[in-house]
Amino acid sequence: MHLRRIQTARDSGHRLSDIDPLVINRGDWPRLPLIDVDSAGQCQEILGFGGAFTESACTVLASLPEDEREAILQAYFHPGDGIGYRLARTHVNSCDFSLGNWSCWEGPDATLDLSRYEQRIFPAIRGAQRIAGDPIRLLVSPWSPPAWMKTSGQMNHGGSLLPSRRDTWAQALCDWIRGSQQAGIAVWGLTVQNEPAANQVWESCLYSAREERDFVRDHLGPALQAAGLDRQRLLVWDHNRDAVYHRAQVVLSDPDAARYVWGTGFHWYSGDQFENLDRLHHAFPNKHLLFTEGCWEGGVQLGRWDRGERYAHHIIGDLNHWTEGWLDWNLALDRHGGPNHVGNWCDAPIIVDADRGIWTRQSSYWYIGHFSRYILPGARRLFSTQAGNGLESVAARNPDGSLVIVVCNRGDRPLSAALRIDGAWAELTVPAHAIQTLIGDPR
């Protein structure tokens, strides 16, 4: 038996490149650190991987000639020629990665206006859906209600939702989902609020845990149900792992609120804290975990290899701690890391130089692809152990029965391990600053 082996490595030209397969042996394995995979030890189902259609990302895409714009969508969403994205996210109203503050409801008497989305965002999502073929699961998140619904009277700098506007905002979110669906953009899920504990200089809105619980229980949940939208998955928190358990458990411990909630979304900006995901999963095993945002802050640094390694570390950590899907932030940005209307520059897996009409894949693109191209929607994460020598790994079984194991080495020297699968084994070596995906034939 052989395992197909795909590699990306800093110090070679390998970029999702096939290299010599691994030969599987029987009998005693060598005295090496052990990665032990139990093919019968199935854990959570994997929904897939994806990124965000922000107004900024879609503006950058629109700055390119049509064939180059199509090539980027192919690179992300095509199941064979690309890296097989099947998840996506976008924002309700503007966010920091927009061209300025704007809302779909400019006043108390205004009706829903999706014209801003039809300029660039919806066309890009439609293009991705056409390329993907299979349905894309789209998650939508508000950064702020319209200014007139808030205590602060502005979309930026925090503030809270006015108590008198809770029903209004809940109904507005229902209208947004229905309006987008009428425009041919199917919504899979909704988060209550992006980063509800962050008072940002850009669009933000603060909720305490109890305020989020009460809004879900008394306003948003009933509104979604009354509108016939209760099949849309509702996620709480949508902020960092550090407080994911403490925040989510306030909502999920209330049965009247929890019945409306599919699961919890979270980000990476506070650090690893993967153990908090375990704690939340074990406390509420019937609810779900979804990574909803992560990116490198501080602008673009072309060619930096640590970009991809950070992604692999977090994807492996999240999947090994019950996460079911993984969403990157902006699909593409310009060479400065924008546009961003408050100067919050970030990096992205694809960087576009519109003046030259070219685009570049960062290491993060290749590293994400080691998961998203090969761990397919409907896969089951398998129980596996870590080698303990610096190699990080995760294993999954695809719906067709094929086995997928991703192994990453972020260190400065090659690392070896004995990979054992149900008693059979192979000796595996991963070069310094490299990642490998191993694929076994369907059983």
Across the structure, where does each feature detected by a protein language model lie?
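C-terminal beta-strand-rich structural cap/linker in extracellular carbohydrate-active enzymes
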Residues: V430-R443
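Loop/turn elements at helix/coil->beta-strand transitions in domains of secreted/extracellular proteins
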Residues: D81-A88, G133-R137, A183-G189, L229-R233, ...
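Alpha-helical scaffolding within the catalytic cores
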Residues: D28-G41, P123-A124, D175, D218-H219, ...
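Conserved, mostly hydrophobic/aromatic
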Residues: G51, G84, L138, L190, ...
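Aromatic/acidic polysaccharide-binding cleft in carbohydrate-active enzymes
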Residues: H288-Y367, F383-Q386
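Active-site neighborhood of glycoside hydrolase catalytic domains
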Residues: T168-D175, G179-A186, P196-G299
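N-terminal catalytic cores of secreted or lumenal carbohydrate-active enzymes
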Residues: H14-V187, S208, D218
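Carbohydrate-binding surface patches
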Residues: R373, S384-D422, H433
